[in-house]
A protein has these predicted regions:
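Short "lid" loop at the C-terminus of a central beta-strand within the Rossmann-like core
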Residues: 13-15, 48-53
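Charged helix-capping and loop-helix junction motifs
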Residues: 22-31, 61-65
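Conserved beta-strand signature within the Rossmann-like core of class I S-adenosyl-L-methionine
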Residues: 31-49
Length: 99
């Protein structure tokens, strides 16, 4: 097993080879819970967001920013969503184990 101060995932959860959104959500949630147990400082990841959760024909996952924030708050504590106005659908989530 390993531990790390920071775990950063860029693009990791933006593609899924199936259009089954529930399967993606299970994979995503299980993965974050596993990685959270291995970080000592913070976990950072990005997702594509949309008002309607979906997986496109090309496999790109769009999820709800609010749903992700709620999941992270209830499982890990405080979460910060960072949005760059130049790419507003790409949201970076930062979850710290310390203040």
């Amino acid at each position: 097993t390993f531990t790390a101060e920071f775990i950063i995932m860029s693009g990791t959860y933006n593609f899924f080879p199936s259009k089954d959104f529930n399967s993606w959500r299970l994979y995503f949630c299980k993965s974050l819970k596993t990685l959270w147990s291995k970080t000592t400082c913070a976990m950072i990841f990005n997702l594509q967001t949309s008002d309607q959760e979906k997986i496109t024909d090309g496999g790109i996952v769009y999820t709800s920013k609010e749903e992700i924030e709620n999941f992270c708050k209830s499982n890990f504590g405080n979460v910060k969503a960072v949005i760059n106005p130049a790419i507003p659908k790409d949201v970076t989530f930062v979850i710290k184990k310390w203040s």
